[in-house]
Amino acid sequence: MSLDTVVEDVRDEARARAEDIREAAESEADEIVAEAEADAERIREERLAEVDRQIDQEREQTLSSAKLEAKQERLGARRDVLEDVYDDVEAAIEGLDGDRRRELTETLLDATLAEFDDDEDVAVYTHTEDVDLVEELVEDRNAVVDGEIDCLGGVVAESDTSRVRVNNTFDSILESVWDDELKNISERLFDQ
């Protein structure tokens, strides 16, 4: 065998080895590229899913906020209507006159004085415009009109001996009835 043949064999062997290395490197590079592409696709899908979740979450938050705001608006409007109704009732009570006012005041005075012992001296307070009426109603009773109070009508009475104070004003009756009946009033007004 000649030197040329040996050199040629070594070259062929080197070429074959280089080809094997190149093929192995290409195969490994293809695997790396395929893995990178798969990772990139997985990351892209994860990001898209996260964006979709964020969009859904923001949509739900926006919807919830809008529903809450609408509910608050409805409640505010209902509160305003109820306040208007209360004001109208107050105005109607304040506008009572004549026999109806006398009848209601006398009923409240009777209920108030019933809370005291018969021998107690009772001081009665009433609305400015009702002083004359109440003075007339307390005649021949153990009570005297002792002043005026800021109210729609009715009476407040107290006794020094028993330290009892009874508030039977139109205001207190209205407030009590309003509190007790607010749910029914609301249901009737808003058909719930």
Swiss-Prot record:
One of its GO terms (biological process) is proton motive force-driven plasma membrane ATP synthesis. Component of the A-type ATP synthase that produces ATP from ADP in the presence of a proton gradient across the membrane. It comes from Halorubrum lacusprofundi (strain ATCC 49239 / DSM 5036 / JCM 8891 / ACAM 34). HAMAP family: ATP_synth_E_arch. Coiled coil: none annotated. This is A-type ATP synthase subunit E. Keywords: ATP synthesis, Cell membrane, Hydrogen ion transport, Ion transport, Membrane, Transport. GO terms for molecular function: ATP binding; proton-transporting ATP synthase activity, rotational mechanism; proton-transporting ATPase activity, rotational mechanism. The keyword Transport applies. Belongs to the V-ATPase E subunit family. It is a peripheral membrane protein. It comes from the Archaea.
